[in-house]
Amino acid sequence: NLKKLLSNQNIEKIFHFARADMTFIKQYLNIKVQNVNCTKIMSKLARSYSDRHGLKDLVKEFLGIEISKQLQSSDFGGTLNEKQLKYCACDVIYLHKIYSSLKEILIREKRYELYKQAISYIDTRVDLDLALFTEDIWSH
């Protein structure tokens, strides 16, 4: 069962831009995803030398592979075609490798604990998004 898997604290989940996925999951499945990691947040803390933190950029930098995001906006509402299935599978395969590389950098740069603190805020950010608070409530 997908709900059990996503809410299981003992199983680590890796997303890229977890905030969006978790908002969708909470809204439609009414569950809180547990034990979450986000390669986008990791990238922003680990790769402070760059302003390019999209999955396409990370795949290129860490894996040396050019990926097309053309299918990203295709219709995933019905039966998926071969290209869509491959797109989804590649995202999952790439995320594990990227996660490992980013974690290594965060540990080396002594930013891993900061990342853990940042990711612990994601549940609150999801709740704010669902309550339609899209502005940064911490800004002046």
Label for each model-derived stretch:
Residues 82-140:
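Mixed-charge, glycine-rich, non-catalytic linkers/tails in nucleic-acid processing enzymes
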Residues 1-105:
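Conserved DEDDh/DEDDy metal-dependent 3′-5′ exonuclease domain
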